Amino acid sequence: MDGELVAFDTDGRPDLPRLLRRHGLTDPWRIRQARHWCPVRYVLFDLLYHAGRCLVREPLARRREVLAEVCQRLDAAVRFSAGVIDVGTAFYQAAVACGHEGVMAKHLTSAYRPGKRSAAWKKIKPGLRKGLASTGANCG
C-alpha cells in the first residue's frame, strides 16, 4: 500500500506542524499520550501488491479499484483517499481551502514506478498549477 500519515486539528483539517511535533517524540509515555492530542490516520492512495500478486504494472484505475475494495475491510485508522476524475480544478481549490498543501494529479493509465517520479504524476501546489490539465486527482 502507498499512502501517508495525516494528523488532524480539532476541526478535522490536516495539520502538518502537529504531525511533525508528534513525529519528534521519543519518550514512550508521551508517544502514548499523543494519540489523544494528535490522532493520525493512514490515508491510502495506491495498492502495489494484493493477494500475492504485484500490481505495479497495472493501470492506476485498476489498482485503485482493488484498493477501494480492500479499504472496506480495514480499521477506521486507515482511510481510502477517494480521488476525483474530470473536476480537478474544483477539487484542487477545495483541498487547498481545507488545509492540504495541494493535490497529486495522476494519469489513470499510469503504472506505479517505485522510487521514481513519473511524468504521468504531477504535484500541483498553489502557484504551480498553470498549464496543467487534471485527468484525476487525490489529496495528499
Where are these regions (language model features)?
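Catalytic cores of nucleic-acid ligases and guanylyltransferases
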Residues: 1-140
